[in-house]
């Protein structure tokens, strides 16, 4: 992981966001995004004290995806995370899980947060397995929270606390 930089806001990134077939379950891909909107999102995020954007890179340093910590609650020490592998052909297997593990370490030990959570469509099996491999626990669900292909789908909630993370990684 490295900080997302202005040079990363390019046609490749835009094509990932607009690829609804490959990123079917990523909510930010539901509507077409323009270059202007993507740049605005990046600039707004840079100014925020409650979100941090990262580039996911392969071993060659190629930008293959993004992840974020957002809605940081500095009082209750918690945040939501999101991630997307956009360049699947240059992505080694397990890149999403590894990125999540690095994100967890950063959130717990650099930001001193206590809880990380996310919501995942129950049909997104790849993401569910990745969350479980990274030590996240399925702690509940929100019924019929997503409308996909004319069907309401449940969202599964995954979380991990600093104590759980430390127990797994010590």
Give the role of each language-model region:
Residues 41-44, 145:
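Short, P/G- and charge-enriched loop/turn segments at secondary-structure junctions
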Residues 43-55:
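A short helix-loop-beta-strand connector motif used in the catalytic cores of GNAT acetyltransferases and
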Residues 18-22, 31, 47, 163:
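Residue-level marker of structural boundaries
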